[in-house]
Design a protein with these regions (language model features):
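Short acidic, glycine/serine/threonine-rich loops at helix termini
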Residues: 61-67, 108-111, 209-211, 235-241, ...
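Glycine-rich loop/linker segments at domain edges
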Residues: 2-3, 69-77, 141-186, 276-361, ...
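Extended active-site and interfacial segments that coordinate phosphate-rich ligands
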Residues: 22, 110-123, 203, 214-215, ...
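Phosphate/diphosphate-binding loops
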Residues: 100-101, 256-303, 521-546
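Helix-loop-helix junctions that connect adjacent transmembrane helices in secondary transporters/permeases
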Residues: 131-216, 382-458, 645-664
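C-terminal catalytic domains of large/alpha subunits in multi-subunit enzymes
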Residues: 55, 218-225, 253-258, 287, ...
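Flexible, low-hydrophobicity surface segments
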Residues: 1-140
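Thiamine diphosphate
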Residues: 229-255, 259-262, 269, 476-480
Length: 721
């Protein structure tokens, strides 16, 4: 730890003297028709060079959402770069001020005037689904994608069978903000070749280039280069392009370098959030055996006004509600809904926390109705030979029984401790949750990397494995080191070129815990090809000079495609080749008088395949658990003004996260993972919140099904004496 990393805001200090600093003129309403934009007063402000509107955008002025499914009713071209006809959400940008300083730019942005015709604001999915709601995007219904899942037999007979116990409940997971410390920042310029170069916190460089190029009116890769800044945590919000296109518009319009930095209020109000899910789940289990025989689901994804990746996110409900259990018969319907609240962006877990919260809380309700211990019910029903996932896929490993065995003594000790330490004033409880998540984007996802032997015998690895705090450089280097073992190359002789589309191939976005599996395998393939090219027929390996003398290629391109199959009709398929598995146990204390909950300990049994770097992996799991505590108890972005600061949005403080976080690893090698590894980042946020909610119920009898579990909710849910 040196503190020498230069982040995007630091770069402004070193940019050329003619650099323009940008500020956005943004809407302060959530839904309106734009009748006019008056920039005249702003243009007269000190230091202002240009004030840009949609009229200055050279291309389509749209960011494509890259529609994933043919039955999506939208076309994906619904998000403006600079809004021209309508305001779709609070904070939409209508103009860019380009000035000689950030202070001058911000002062002028406040002088831009909008003539708006206000429209009804639909701030939740139920409001946007109402019969009298107008279309947010005229021509596209507010409900624009509707997946349906069918697995096994019709479920109705199982719910009608008197030999089965039935439980059902309704759930809500909130619009969780990412609460990264570093606000969004980026800059751009025209290079010596006349290409537009954009530096940002992007975690999907090639993806974002394809999304913004048509809107800017440039061709990729001929006229556009994307480079990732040194980046702290993004937790997924940068899976969506945020300011990249805005910077591009300004550079192309002015011909000068441009720098844009959000303050924290803008970070909250003008970047994406976790999409809320409204979910209903029913389960039926045999009274005598406790085996789950059927499940019915209904889920609604409130994805805000912009459709990008909304269909894929909604599909996660089909894939992960009830995941981890061998449920033979499933029926369910989901829907993606456009609203006027914050646009839906990827967030760690990407549909997993939303989908597994309802089924994991319902598992506790089912256990109570069956008269079983929640641990025993989960252990009985977890994946075993012959079971399949909700999408009908055979799990790649059968590791859950081993994980339950590892947790059992911890669970029994925790129950005894809670019973012994509970008082009339402070009740203590223990809660469990099982979580499963896929490592990758759906279906035959792929990634590319290259390996090159250098004259000094070192090897350079090139990839676009974007780093947003998870340790991509270490992951790339460690994977390459393992693959290059035959030539005995020490790790210090492995160099990295990363995250510049003019130099590195399309490795795909760093999201969905895909990079270790996908890009790790691409690096492995490139390195193995290089090793084979260096191998002498009679043993040993060629040097660089010998390779060049014999005309052997010192550069090898590697590509790897996942052996997976997209979910097709009825959401059945094999969407991931590698999964991650987690068992979570929460120990909580609840103040009976106030409903305030304190998490005293979290235990996680994790199976993420072979651990590549224990220090990094520990950090990933600890961080995800901390975010899960926030998701359970405090975090939200519902009130646009109240929740626009870190404290207002409920970020957990050091007092809210227990020092006692215990990690237990079960390392089951993955057949398709690089050297047996799977992903890591998503799984620690898929299960803490239901475990905490179940622990609250175990402590005081308060069942909270709509997150976050604020003290007043817990207090209201406590049984009345």
């Amino acid at each position: 730890m040196t503190g020498l990393a230069e982040y995007g805001a630091d770069a402004a200090v070193h940019m050329p003297p003619d650099t323009l600093h940008l500020a956005l003129a943004q809407a302060k309403v959530s839904h309106a028709i734009i009748k006019g934009i008056d920039t005249s007063e702003a243009e007269k402000m000190p230091g202002v060079v240009r004030v840009l509107t949609h009229k200055d955008v050279k291309g389509k002025n749209r960011i494509t959402g890259l529609i994933n499914f043919a039955d999506n009713k939208g076309d994906g071209w619904d998000r403006p770069i600079l809004n021209d006809t309508k305001v779709f959400q609070y904070g939409d940008a209508l103009a860019i001020v380009c000035a000689d300083s950030e202070a001058h730019a911000r002062a002028a942005a406040d002088k831009v005037k909008f003539d708006l015709e206000l429209l009804p604001e639909y701030m939740s999915a139920p409001e946007a689904m109402a019969p009298d709601a107008i279309e947010i995007h005229p021509g596209t219904p507010n409900i624009y994608y509707e997946p349906h899942i069918e697995k096994g037999e019709d479920t109705k007979p199982f719910f009608d069978d008197p030999e089965n116990v039935v439980v059902e409940d309704s759930f809500y997971t909130q619009r969780q903000p990412h609460l990264n410390i570093e606000p969004d920042v980026g800059y751009g310029y025209l290079n010596e070749q006349g290409q537009l170069v954009i530096h940002s916190k992007s975690i999907g460089l090639h993806l974002h280039a394809l999304m913004i190029a048509p809107g800017l009116g440039v061709k990729f890769p001929e006229e556009l280069v994307m480079v990732q800044n040194t980046t702290g945590g993004t937790f997924g919000y940068k899976f969506s392009p945020t300011m990249e296109a805005l910077i591009g518009v300004a550079v192309l319009a002015t011909g000068r370098p441009c720098h844009l930095r959000y303050n924290y209020q803008q970070q909250q109000q003008y970047t994406g959030k976790r999409s809320p899910f409204w979910t209903k789940v029913r389960m039926a289990a045999n009274k005598k055996t406790g085996k789950i025989v059927a499940m019915e689901t209904d889920w609604t994804c409130d994805h805000g006004p912009y459709s990008e990746f909304g269909d894929l996110l909604t599909l996660r409900g089909a894939q992960f509600i009830g995941a981890g259990y061998g449920i033979p018969n499933i029926r369910g319907d989901g829907r993606t809904v456009a609203t006027n609240h914050a646009w839906g962006a990827a967030f760690r877990g990407y549909g997993g926390p939303e989908s597994e919260f309802p089924s994991e809380v319902l598992m506790d309700e089912l256990a109570e109705k069956l008269g079983m211990d929640p641990f025993d019910l989960r252990e009985l029903n977890c994946y075993k030979e012959g079971d399949t996932t909700p999408t009908g896929q055979k799990p790649e490993v059968m590791n859950l029984p081993t994980m339950f065995k590892a947790l059992r003594p911890k669970y029994e000790a925790a129950k005894a401790k809670a019973k012994a330490e509970s008082t009339d004033a402070v009740k203590r409880g223990v809660g469990l949750a099982l979580a499963v998540y896929g490592a990758g984007l759906d279906g035959p996802d792929s990634s590319e990397a290259w390996a090159e032997l250098n004259p000094d015998g070192s090897v350079t690895i090139g990839s676009s494995w974007e780093d947003h705090g998870q340790g991509a450089d270490s992951g790339a280097q460690c994977t390459a080191h393992e693959a290059l073992r035959p030539i005995g190359l020490p790790v210090e002789k492995i160099r990295l070129v990363m995250n510049d589309t003019s130099k590195t191939p399309n490795s795909g976005p760093a999201g969905g815990s895909r990079s270790q599996v996908m890009t790790g395998n691409a690096i492995r393939v490139a390195c193995e090809q290089l090793v084979e090219a260096m191998r002498k027929p009679d043993g040993g390996f060629y040097t660089y000079d010998e390779m060049k003398a014999e005309g052997r290629a010192v550069h090898q391109d590697g590509k790897w495609t996942a052996p997976a199959r997209d979910c097709g009709k009825n959401c059945q398929g094999e969407p991931f080749c590698c999964y991650m598995y987690g068992l979570f146990m929460a120990e909580v204390a609840v103040e009976v008088a106030t409903g305030k909950t304190k998490v005293e300990k979290m235990t996680m049994v994790a199976d993420i395949g072979k651990v590549v770097n224990r220090l990094l992996t520990d950090g990933q799991l600890y961080g995800g658990i901390a975010q899960g505590i926030g998701l359970a108890l405090t975090e939200d972005y519902e009130d646009i003004k109240k929740h626009s600061t870190m404290a207002g949005a409920g970020i957990p403080t050091i007092k809210d996260i227990p020092d006692d976080l215990e990690l237990i690893y079960v390392e089951t090698p993955r057949p398709d993972g690089p050297f047996g590894a799977s992903g890591t980042g998503e799984i620690p946020l898929c299960g803490p919140h239901p475990a905490i909610i179940n622990a609250i119920y175990n402590a005081c009898g308060a069942r909270v099904t709509h997150l976050p579990a604020y003290p007043e909710k817990v207090l209201a849910a406590m049984p009345k004496k």
